[in-house]
Amino acid sequence: MKDFENDLIYYPNPDPVKEPRFILKSVDELEKSTKYSVTCNGTERVVYHTDSFDYVVVVDNEAYDLEISIHTPYEKLEIRPSSFGIVPFVKGETVHIHLDEPRKFTVETDGGLHDALFVLCSHRIEKPADTTICFEKGKVYNVGVLTLKSNDTVYIEEGAVVSGCVYADHCDNISIVGNGIINGACWHLPDSNAHRFFIYAKWCNNVLLKGFTAVDGPSWHVVPAACDHVVIDDMNIMSRIVTGDGIDITSSQDVEVKNCFIRSTDDSICIKSQRLFEDPSTVRDVTKVRVHNNVIWNAEPGNAIELGYALQSEIHDLVFEDCDIIHCQYEGNMGGAAISIHQADGGHVHDIHYKNIRVEQAQQKLFDIKVLLCRYTEQLAKGEINDIYFDNIQVLNGDIPVSMIRGYQTPTEEVRVHDVHFDNITFMGNKCETWQDMRLVTELANDIYVNGVRTCRQMKF
């Protein structure tokens, strides 16, 4: 078991893992939970275990009658997101839950952050008629790196486990669908990151990722880079090592992310525009991105919904709405925010909309908007941040977090964050009327509005 206070290991330049470290011979080799067991509609489901979480993928086309047995004593039980209104009936060690439609939620006992159960419900996805690569139920496939080509449709059947990574480069019309699992543990050491993306599509057009579970990858988990027309739907994305970002939308356009569950040990949903593996072709504008109806757990480190740090081209017309951030854990470094924009480069960031977002726990910061110079910087001239809109952001539990807005100043350059709008921000049901209510700290920022009233205009020196 990890010591999460002292042994969260980050190697900025990890030794390369040049080939898979192990071969899975059977689905039975994946560790199973001893704390939880789950049945749905009378059928027992497999509950997997990691040192950071347990999880069960529940696939059915009917209503869900769940029986979750918890085999260790506990005093307090929490089901998140609370917005789902799930009311459990507890009898003995068994928690009974009925769902009329598939939901993705957590079962947490006594506030434990590393032994929760993720219950990940989905409708069954049938095998598409145009399937070109099929992974069948009950089997393990050691693919190393699965390289796709144009018009590939990958089907991962419920109960199949694919061990390895998936890459696509300059492909059109590719899909990965199904209710099975892709496991990336073979590409990194047990307690460290590796210099390799998990599911990586570069310069692809018309990409669909739907239904499957991506768990324990070597670094960033789902990375559409310089892609157009991407849909990420109903995925379960879970990491347990540092730099284990959930989804990194990098230099891509016309992207939709919906109905996903993301638990990440770094940024959960992240927007970037930067060189990847020294490739300058992956620097491009990011626009027309919609992220909605997702459940997000940001474990240490990183941020839950992040723009940055590498924003080297224009970032505009993005919408984040109707999401539940159930945890944003304390980082103690530059990140640790539920919603953040970190501009370390020269791209202009504007017209970004956040609406109807519920935050159940933000241990460090709620909003964090900065222009800065840091170790991720590649462009010294800094881009502006302006016309940022927050509407109906609710903090539901926990301590009231601080928020920060800060521009950038040197003897030769000044870049101020401006025109940031906060409307209907509430802490435990209490509406914030002023920046003081929000615990908002500003520096080198102009024209900050709270409920339509300009509250901050700082003098230039």
Regions found by a protein language model. Name each.
Residues 1-461:
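Extracellular/periplasmic carbohydrate-active domains that bind, remodel
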